[in-house]
Amino acid sequence: MELIVAVYDDWGIGREGTQPIALSADRKFFRQMTKGAMVIVGRRTIDDFPGKQPLPGRVNVALTRQDMQIPGFTVVNSPEEAAQLGKNAERAMVIGGGSIYRQMLPYCDTAYITKVHTTPNSDTYFPNLDADPAWCLTEVLQSGEENGIGYEMCLYKRV
């Protein structure tokens, strides 16, 4: 299973449920990488989707502890259940938020990390894969600058 996330220099990923700084290059990268894949997302992150609708061109899976139906989503109630669905998919990607990343990281072997070179005041963080001996940066896929902010799209693999 794979995951995709944008992190700031301090590995922050958001504040109060939103991305303080979002780059159009990262949004494009996200669309390219997730198109056609199964995406696993938390219920609170769905609230940030346009119209709270499923992402088009993807199989949308919501991971939540709540017993609920979400139109357009397959709802699962445990990381194990999400991982099992992911194993049966051609490609499955964890797309957040913070709690879902923490729960699903043990099931992932590939991480697409956009490093955004700034440090806004985050309250939610992704584990620092550079400090984790179980993960290795294998490739910088793309780099650039947008609105004066540098970024790199990086590929990490579990070793």
Feature locations, PLM:
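Enzymes that bind and transform nitrogen-containing heteroaromatic metabolites
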Residues: 1-159
